[in-house]
């Protein structure tokens, strides 16, 4: 209900947060499933009792992505206990795994991925070729008067969105665009996140037909 009902919606007139953008783009990366980002994986009491275990919707096994925008790590954060002991519960560990809902056909996301990969191979995201990877897809974004500059991109494992701008919208300056301001930040992070990781792209689903077209005769 927050999307403006006007013809320029396709050009980006809606206001979205980086988290909302990254959540939406995860559907492209995982082959068409709706996931829910989360931060806390598990909560334990000071006695080691499990009080909470996250159960985000997960992409079915055999499909491209994992649950959430980024998989939880093994690193644990300890919070100093407060007076009073919360009752231990085992219900949190007995949840049935939630299955993510498919919201886009796999053939549609495959074609879209191919188009977004061309942004990096041939378009405004060409700087990302410096990462030396063949599995990256993304898109630059720049609002009127360069008040916002974006770059969103992914491979089959990670989705990252970078926004640059001011709290009170004003121009970032002349010739400041998504490809010149946001993309270098995205490259710095993704270069580290994907270091030594093998390429991971969405497999071609059934029902896709690829043909070569003669550029002269069509």
Model-derived segments and spans:
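Mid-domain, small-residue-enriched loop/turn segments at the edges of structured enzyme/sensor domains
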Residues: 1-23
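A penicillin-recognizing enzyme superfamily signal
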Residues: 15-218
């Amino acid at each position: 209900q927050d999307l403006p009902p006007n013809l320029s919606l396709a050009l980006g007139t809606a206001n979205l947060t980086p988290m909302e953008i990254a959540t939406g783009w995860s559907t492209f990366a995982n082959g068409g499933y709706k996931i829910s980002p989360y931060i806390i994986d598990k909560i334990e009491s000071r006695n080691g009792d499990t009080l909470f275990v996250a159960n985000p919707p997960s992409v079915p096994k055999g499909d491209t992505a994992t649950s959430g925008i980024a998989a939880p790590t093994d690193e644990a954060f300890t919070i100093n206990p407060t007076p009073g002991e919360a009752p231990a519960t085992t219900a949190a560990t007995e949840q049935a795994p939630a299955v993510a809902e498919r919201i886009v056909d796999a053939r549609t996301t495959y074609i879209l991925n191919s188009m977004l990969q061309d942004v990096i191979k041939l378009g405004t995201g060409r700087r990302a070729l410096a990462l030396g990877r063949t599995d990256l897809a993304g898109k630059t974004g720049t609002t009127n008067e360069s008040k916002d500059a974006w770059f969103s991109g992914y491979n089959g494992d990670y989705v990252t969105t970078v926004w640059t701008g001011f709290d009170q919208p004003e121009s970032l300056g002349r010739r400041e665009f998504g490809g010149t301001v946001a993309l270098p930040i995205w490259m710095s992070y993704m270069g580290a996140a994907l270091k030594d990781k093998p390429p991971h792209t969405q497999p071609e689903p059934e029902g896709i037909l690829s043909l070569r077209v003669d550029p002269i005769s069509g």
